[in-house]
């Protein structure tokens, strides 16, 4: 993989266990789907490079790999994140009700300027759907963040989800860069946050 890129964005996938975070990551990074995806305890991440507006963006996407079941997600997971995707299961109301709890975690640990995206996954399971599109969108509107419904299984809106949050981060960084030009040196850009390339603790597949 080439090391040539204009931006390096750290993205997080958070949400209740079994909402399909690992499946979304696998679909976007490898264009694959495993129905019985089993996460090991740890933190897994995958990398994919995309092109957007003539810029090369390297996305480093982190998955909690089962830690959310034990509430062991720590501040180190959120540190340096540019974007966070909050995922719920369209067929599981409890996972939707817990979204605000995850948002409070973000507020507690993440950078206040972090970009957020709300995703309702498993949208292909129409007959089992209990969280309507309107309900999901209403919450996203209340929070002032983008919203998409996805299906990792049928590859619906998965690509669009990651492109959307990458675009939001790039747009925010552009506005910060302009602010830096007017305010002079000494301001800190999101791009300046170091990201450790640590391949340890990858979840087994």
Curated annotation (Swiss-Prot):
Domain of life (superkingdom): Eukaryota
InterPro entries the record matches: P-loop_NTPase, Small_GTP-bd, Small_GTPase, Small_GTPase_Rab
Keyword Nucleotidyltransferase: no
Localization terms from the record: Golgi apparatus, trans-Golgi network membrane; Golgi apparatus membrane
Modification N-acetylserine occurs at: 2
Residues covered by region (Disordered): 174-205
Name this polypeptide is given: Ras-related protein RABD1
Organism: Arabidopsis thaliana
Encoding gene (name): RABD1
């Amino acid at each position: 993989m080439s090391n040539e890129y204009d931006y390096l964005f750290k993205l997080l996938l958070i949400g209740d266990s079994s909402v399909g975070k690992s499946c979304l990551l696998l679909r976007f990074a490898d264009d694959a789907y495993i129905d019985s995806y089993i996460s090991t305890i740890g933190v897994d991440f995958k990398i994919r490079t995309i092109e957007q507006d003539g810029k090369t963006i390297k996305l480093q996407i982190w998955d909690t790999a089962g830690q959310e079941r034990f509430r062991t997600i720590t501040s180190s997971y959120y540190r340096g994140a540019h974007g966070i995707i909050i995922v719920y299961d369209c067929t599981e109301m409890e996972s939707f009700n817990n979204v605000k709890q995850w948002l409070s975690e973000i507020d507690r640990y993440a950078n206040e300027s972090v970009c957020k995206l709300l995703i309702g996954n498993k949208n292909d399971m129409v007959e089992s759907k209990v969280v309507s599109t309107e309900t999901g969108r209403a919450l996203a509107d209340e929070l002032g963040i983008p919203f998409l419904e996805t299906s990792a299984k049928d590859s619906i809106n998965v690509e669009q989800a990651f492109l959307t949050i990458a675009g939001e981060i790039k747009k925010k960084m552009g506005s910060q860069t302009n602010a830096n030009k007017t305010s002079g040196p000494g301001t800190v850009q999101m791009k300046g946050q170091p990201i450790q390339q640590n391949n340890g603790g990858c979840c087994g597949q």
